[in-house]
């Protein structure tokens, strides 16, 4: 399907307002890119890149009238609407652009993220996760997602039940089941993310083992392992809920944490977790541990 792509130049302080306006205007997905070329596709729940200046590429349905869209956004954003560009990405051009950017990527010893439709030669024992060119909400390219994927790859989760809190695309829940977990529930507060999780689970043949729910609609569930890739402030606010989401003796991994924030996150759990040494990737940190009480 062709897409209308709108590009804006956004100051970091205006990003929340612009993000919300684009979503309300019907954006299907958004990509953030810094001046240095760093790309972040559809940040996780509540996550925003900490850059001074951000280029935002937003995709809209092909029937969207760009002039009417500009008028709508200008009315909402005023002077914050800067750098406007609009172009139509035809079917082949859009998919080609995605495939050119996303090569198969390895995480840990076994996991590979592969664009749907690509058939790369992977090493023996590789566990591929297929993602769609039109995917929103995360692809593994961001450091926090990479840290979580590598953690899952190194954990003995075979036959166990997991919980992916703030699942976005469901990439972590899908990866867990593809690595041998019996089940991994994906929960998110964004309805589009719930749909994306279900679609990606179906795409990878694990739909029955990756149930997806809105946060406030999920059934009671206590997991053997839990992974949450959301902002540090949200992890702090949800510490009790996250701790209670995993059984005593179970494992949890938390990311979306900037260097220097890890102690604040761990302290929020007020004991009851035996923490491992933090793992770092760039400016980001993953903390993991075992629930002891």
Swiss-Prot record:
- Which top-rank group of organisms is this from? Bacteria
Where does this polypeptide localize? Cytoplasm
| EC nos | 2.1.1.-
One GO term describing the cellular component: cytosol
Q: Which residues bind S-adenosyl-L-methionine?
A: 145, 166, 188, 229
The reply to whether 4Fe-4S figures as a keyword in the UniProt entry is no
Catalytic activity entry = L-lysyl-[protein] + 3 S-adenosyl-L-methionine = N(6),N(6),N(6)-trimethyl-L-lysyl-[protein] + 3 S-adenosyl-L-homocysteine + 3 H(+)
Protein name listed in UniProt: Ribosomal protein L11 methyltransferase
Main subcellular location: cytoplasm
- Keywords from the named record: Cytoplasm, Methyltransferase, S-adenosyl-L-methionine, Transferase
Give the signal peptide range.
Answer: none
Give yes or no: UniProt keyword Nucleotidyltransferase.
no
| Record-stated family | Belongs to the methyltransferase superfamily. PrmA family.
GO BP field: methylation
Physiological role: Methylates ribosomal protein L11.
Cited Pfam families: PrmA
Recall the GO molecular function terms of this protein's record: protein-lysine N-methyltransferase activity
Taxonomic lineage: Bacteria, Pseudomonadati, Pseudomonadota, Gammaproteobacteria, Chromatiales
The EC class name is transferase
